[in-house]
Amino acid sequence: MILAKVTGHVVATQKCDELRGSNLLLITQLDDDQQPMKNRTWVAVDSVGAGMHDIVLAEEYLALNKDRYKAMSVVAIVENVFRDA
């Protein structure tokens, strides 16, 4: 799982059957200081109703259909992050 920030929305008029009815988000992975990382941006399926600038938890999974592919899914909206200094 990765900690990421929602940085945009993706509009797709044609989607595979598994993605129909799903919202797609642009997410950027955050580093340990919760700053966006360069070259770490993905499109993810929104499973929780996340919005722009939300901090989210995302996971990568293998979709098991006729064409196996990897996909990213937003699975939680993060309220707070606590860590030892």
Predicted regions and their residues:
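C-terminal structural segments of small proteins and small subunits
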Residues: 55-85
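Structural detector for short beta-strands of small beta-barrel domains
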Residues: 1-13
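Short, structured beta-strand/loop micro-motifs enriched in basic residues and often containing a Trp
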Residues: 33-41
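A generic structural motif
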Residues: 10, 14, 31, 78-81
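Short aromatic-glycine-enriched beta-strand elements
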Residues: 18-27
